[in-house]
Amino acid sequence: MQDEFDLFRTETKGIKPIKQDTFVAPRQKRDQKKIELKELRAKEDTLFYFSDEYEPLLNDNDGVVKYLRDGEDSHLLKQLRRGDFSPELFLDLHGLTREQAKQELAALLLACENEHVDCASIMTGYGTFTLKKQIPRWLVQHPKVRALHQAPREWGGEAAILILVDL
């Protein structure tokens, strides 16, 4: 065994170690102006569609939040109530501020449009009801929302809202 080590040392005598020549790709600088512009547009969209002062006439006389856009078939609300539509996108708003919730709602509606999803679920939770009462008021202002209804028990019950989006 020692002979092998000696043989190796004699054979490799005078050899210089190879320098590490790994190429590190330069980091791409994110264009800060583009990022700021994108954030500003998202904020403008939420402010444009979701006004806090608007008080729509919602059908909540029996404690169930529901809305149907003018010109839509009244059967849609019944289908939403029964759970005939399965939500493909889910949004959980627990613990968010009003401004954060507005931005998330706008992002959800944009995602529904981009991914061709017509039904989504918004989890509002039970909590202090500030978001739970405000979210339907915001949603009815958006032109893409066809209908909304309190979710059936299997999709969240009183703590969630199902929405139908116009594609």
From Swiss-Prot:
| Record's keyword terms, sorted | Endonuclease, Hydrolase, Nuclease, RNA-binding, rRNA-binding
One example of the protein's molecular function in GO is:
rRNA binding
The cross-references to InterPro entries, in alphabetical order and at most eight, read:
Smr_dom, Smr_dom_sf, SmrB-like
Q: What is its EC number?
A: 3.1.-.-
Q: Does the keyword rRNA-binding apply?
A: yes
Q: Among the record's GO biological process terms, what is one?
A: rescue of stalled ribosome
Task: Provide the Smr domain boundaries.
Answer: 91-166
Enzyme class label = hydrolase
What is this protein for, i.e. what is its function?
Acts as a ribosome collision sensor. Detects stalled/collided disomes (pairs of ribosomes where the leading ribosome is stalled and a second ribosome has collided with it) and endonucleolytically cleaves mRNA at the 5' boundary of the stalled ribosome. Stalled/collided disomes form a new interface (primarily via the 30S subunits) that binds SmrB. Cleaved mRNA becomes available for tmRNA ligation, leading to ribosomal subunit dissociation and rescue of stalled ribosomes.
User: Which PANTHER family does the UniProt record give?
Assistant: DNA ENDONUCLEASE SMRA-RELATED, UPF0115 PROTEIN YFCN
Name the family: Belongs to the SmrB family.
**Subunit notes for this chain?**
Associates with collided ribosomes, but not with correctly translating polysomes.
Q: What is the recorded name of this protein?
A: Ribosome rescue factor SmrB
Phylogenetic placement of the source organism: Bacteria, Pseudomonadati, Pseudomonadota, Gammaproteobacteria, Pasteurellales
| Protein encoded by which gene | smrB
